[in-house]
Regions:
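Short glycine-rich, Thr/Ser-proximal phosphate-binding strand/loop in the N-terminal lobe
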Residues: 2-51, 136-166
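Short glycine-aspartate micro-motif
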Residues: 15-19, 62-66, 121-125, 193
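Glycine-rich phosphate-binding loops at beta-strand->alpha-helix junctions
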Residues: 24, 183-215
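Glycine-rich phosphate-binding loop plus the immediately following alpha-helix
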Residues: 25, 89-92, 96-111, 120, ...
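Short beta-strand scaffold segments in enzyme catalytic cores
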Residues: 25-29, 71, 113, 130-136
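Residue-level signal for inorganic ion chemistry
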Residues: 27, 67, 194-196, 222
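Glycine-rich phosphate-binding loop and adjoining helix at the ATP-binding site
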Residues: 37, 41-54, 58-66, 71-120, ...
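Short secondary-structure boundary segments
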Residues: 69, 126-128, 196-197
Length: 230
């Protein structure tokens, strides 16, 4: 990486941040300007993810772990297996598996925390589906807004990757803008951050008080889980 998006401070904890996606598992250690990855896919189990990360980072010295998963997570508990991955994510003891203090969070929430600049922020992650999180004066509130009704289906069915493939980029962008406008009207955030792998496909003007995020924010979010109160 040419630019570091996660901080290094004297006495800062050495946090290994793991961002689990449908195609890759990515790992970053704060203080090292390097990102490592390996392929995931629909058969990847929770244990295989941990084993892969441990093998990938044998030469890294860290004291804590943050894991972002594409699944609902409440109070550190994974509610169901990720849709685009394998099984065994809900029953895995992540802290025991890594052998370090470990925090597990929804992947959109982790990226949201890394994008947060105070106040009331709505984060929308455009990728395979629609990730969503609000942060209210420092308190993280993961959401599943993608499942709410929109037009003739749900928000996710229009602005997720399958929606983009069906609509084409031009109509998909219009659906994204309308999604931002509707959710902003209902949730009243101070500002909106749009992240995820498809955020870069949004060219042109964005709605007021809306900006594009950076996928590296997930790693900053993983670090912040151990140094900030949220």
């Amino acid at each position: 990486m040419s630019e570091r998006h996660y901080p290094v401070e004297p006495r800062a904890p050495a946090v290994l941040t793991v961002d689990v996606g449908g195609s890759h598992v990515k790992a970053v250690l704060n203080g090292i300007d390097e990102r490592r990855r390996f392929a995931s896919g629909p058969k990847l189990t929770g244990k295989q993810m941990v084993d892969g990360v441990l093998e990938l980072t044998t030469d890294w010295d860290y004291t804590q772990v943050s894991v972002g998963l594409p699944a609902p997570v409440v109070g550190g508990r994974v509610l169901h297996d990720p849709v685009n991955l394998g099984k065994g994510w809900t029953t895995l003891d992540y802290e025991q598996a890594f052998g370090k203090p470990t925090k597990v969070i929804n992947d959109a929430a982790m990226q949201a925390f890394g994008s947060y600049e105070g106040g009331r922020m709505l984060f929308l992650g455009l990728g395979t589906g629609l990730g969503s999180t609000m942060i209210l004066e420092g308190t993280i509130a993961p959401m599943e807004l993608g499942h709410l009704p929109f037009r003739k289906a749900t928000f996710e069915e229009y602005v997720g990757e399958r929606g983009r493939a069906r609509l084409g980029n031009k109509r998909w962008r219009k659906a994204v803008i309308e999604t931002v406008e509707r959710l902003t009207a209902g949730l009243l955030p101070d500002y909106v951050v749009i992240g995820g792998g498809n955020a870069e496909r949004l060219d042109g003007e964005l709605p007021p008080n809306c900006r594009l995020g950076h996928n590296e924010a997930a790693f900053l979010g993983g670090f912040r889980l151990w140094v900030d109160q949220a």
